[in-house]
Amino acid sequence: MLICVPGILSKDDVAEFRHIMAESDWEDGRSTAGAQSAMVKRNEQLPPDSEVARRLGHRIISAMTANPRFLAAAIPQQIFPPLFNRYAADAGHQFGIHVDNAVRGDKLTGLRIRTDLSVTLFLSEPDEYDGGELVIEDLYGSHEVKLPAGDLVLYPASSLHMVTPVTRGVRVASFFWLQSMIRDPLARSMIFDLDTTIQGLSQRMGRDDPEMVRLTGLYHNLIRYWAET
């Protein structure tokens, strides 16, 4: 399940983030990579324990958890503190094909999560850079993702994926992982489809329609059956 969520950050928010990040110190992105990923990772990151990364990360989490589409798709239990990276054409930055670690730990908070979903929040507009597509592989082939600044994409952390070489400009993004209350990806996908259907039908039938009430009850009972808290 690959889901795009538009407008997590406003354009003004993105501009503010970019200004703050431009004045910050960056480090080799391999500092947070696993052994296999480090061999193919070429980018820069804000230090994960920096005040800037933590402050901006809190703002992203606040914005995401107020977004109905994100909540419906992810059903988040725990969210890893957002990280920030940049890929510059003049440095030959790219990130070769890899899969994310199954478990991530945060040294500052002691948080450990199972990485069910990966998240990329774009902080550069598509016309600011060439290349830099996020390429995600699944059973149906390869999918290229390059979204407007402020939009994010959710995809299974178990997916092979890569960031193609940036050949012009600079690509800036936030990336992180989350553990969902619905561990099984098929169950999570069905819950999302059901939620989307309920939202569409409720606009035509009204939320107080008896069939809508029954359908909403089914939604909550399925979450009750599958959820891990």
Swiss-Prot record:
Entry keywords, A to Z: Dioxygenase, Iron, Metal-binding, Oxidoreductase, Vitamin C
Any one GO MF annotation of this record: L-ascorbic acid binding
Cofactor note: Binds 1 Fe(2+) ion per subunit.
PROSITE patterns the UniProt entry points to: FE2OG_OXY
Record carries keyword Oxidoreductase: yes
Top-level class of the enzyme under EC nomenclature: oxidoreductase
Binding of 2-oxoglutarate, residues: 171
Binding site for Fe cation: 98, 100, 161
Matches recorded under InterPro entries: Oxoglu/Fe-dep_dioxygenase_dom, PKHD_C, PKHD_hydroxylase, Pro_4_hyd_alph, Pro_4_hyd_alph_FE2OG_OXY
GO BP: any one term: DNA damage response
Fe2OG dioxygenase domain mapped to chain residues: 78-180
EC number(s) on file: 1.14.11.-
Cofactor(s) needed by this chain: Fe(2+); L-ascorbate
NCBIfam families: PRK05467.1-2 (NF003973), PRK05467.1-3 (NF003974), PRK05467.1-4 (NF003975)
HAMAP family noted in UniProt: Hydroxyl_YbiX
Protein name from the UniProt record: PKHD-type hydroxylase BRADO6316
Gene source species: Bradyrhizobium sp. (strain ORS 278)
